[in-house]
Amino acid sequence: MSNGIISKFKNWIVDEEEDYIEDEYESGMDDIVQEEEMNSGFSTAKANKIVNLHTTSQMKVVIVEPKVYDEAATIADHLKQRRAVIVNLEGLTNSEVRKSIFNFMNGAVYVLDGSIQKVSKSIFILAPNNVDIDANMKKELESKAFFPWQNK
């Protein structure tokens, strides 16, 4: 009787090992099929969409009032760091320095594919290429109403 129990136990263990090997082989085939599907060249639009969630939280606007030409480089540095810059040139009395700083700012904006918008005679908004400047806002601010729906 003990031989019968031992042989049944052996058969039971051997059967489980055989099943395990077959399962392992079958799962290996599934992996190959999945790899072929992944490498088929077809992909969904959802898989191709890359979204950086940190860009909007890192947005900063810097206000600069340069007094000398050497401070123009700091404006370009802010643009390189993808920060929008409001430049106030009203404090400059020397028109040559004002013109030189303005030319430097225009060059920096051009090289970095940014944009520049005139706010007033001597105040400008410089934006890197990840920031859009809406020129319609100037028209809204020029109107007496604070909100567009107040113009009734």
Swiss-Prot record:
InterPro entries: Cell_div_SepF, Cell_div_SepF/SepF-rel, SepF-like_sf. Pfam families: SepF. Gene3D superfamilies: SepF-like protein. One of its GO terms (biological process) is division septum assembly. It is found in: Cytoplasm. It comes from the Bacteria. Keywords: Cell cycle, Cell division, Cytoplasm, Septation. Its main location: cytoplasm. One of its GO terms (cellular component) is cytoplasm. Belongs to the SepF family. Homodimer. Interacts with FtsZ. Cell division protein that is part of the divisome complex and is recruited early to the Z-ring. Probably stimulates Z-ring formation, perhaps through the cross-linking of FtsZ protofilaments. Its function overlaps with FtsA. This is Cell division protein SepF. It comes from Clostridioides difficile (strain 630) (Peptoclostridium difficile). The lineage of its organism: Bacteria, Bacillati, Bacillota, Clostridia, Peptostreptococcales.
